[in-house]
Amino acid sequence: MREKFEFLLSVRLLECEIKELTIYSRAYCNCYELLNIKLDELCEIMVREETIRQWMVWRRDEEVQRQVDRLRETAAEALCDVEKHQSKSISLIEMDGNKYLTTLIQSVKDDLKSFDINQQSKVLFIGSGAFPISVLTIAKEFGAKVMGLDIDSEAVQIACQVAKAFDIETLVSFSDEKLSSLAFLKETTHIIIASLVKNKIEVLNQLKELIDENVHIMLRYGNGVKSIFNYPFNYDLSEDWNQK
């Protein structure tokens, strides 16, 4: 049992640190750098062999799972704040020379290679956030028309400003509308659902009633130990969707 409580304590400490740094950052923006470092640390911890081993042992423990859920919610809230700060402060020159962003953009490009997006595509990105790197990359690299959708109206406003700053607003738009009233769905050819979208099954159930059967959907999620910083997805879709 000692191992369990050591693991539980490490998760609680991470949650506490991220929560406090989020509060500090809202009061003093220079703390966002510390918060970003802590979120990077969380990403590194997720892939460590020791973390994976501990997760395999304690993943079904209710107390551990509750604490992991709290950490994920805290980290997701912190990431939203970090993205808003980055979007407000970063310039085009900084983006071109930023190693982290360059790596992230390349990761997006690699992830979408098999998704058959081209200049004729109309892409809906659900959960685009305030720092919509995926949306901007799709438009810039593939020449596709992209709409980013997010429930956070402030994030939508900031994302619009980013698109304008990067001179790509002719291909990119953002909205906080409900799926049921989104006119863009009528012309959508591809849909991407972000990993930090919590209610994925509800979104899929809505889409099933709203889209053409030929629309391609990419569902991003993190199961297992990756659920520490990603919302998991554990539903069988074989009866309702054609899967690749």
Short names for language-model regions:
Residues 151-154:
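Conserved SAM/SAH-binding beta-strand->alpha-helix loop
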Residues 130-144:
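Conserved SAM-binding loop of SAM-dependent methyltransferases across substrates and taxa
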Residues 119-130:
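Conserved class I S-adenosyl-L-methionine
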Residues 167-179:
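Conserved SAM-binding strand-loop segment of SAM-dependent methyltransferases
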Residues 40-118:
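Conserved Class I S-adenosyl-L-methionine-dependent methyltransferase catalytic core
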Residues 187-202:
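A short SAM/SAH-binding and catalytic strip from SAM-dependent methyltransferases
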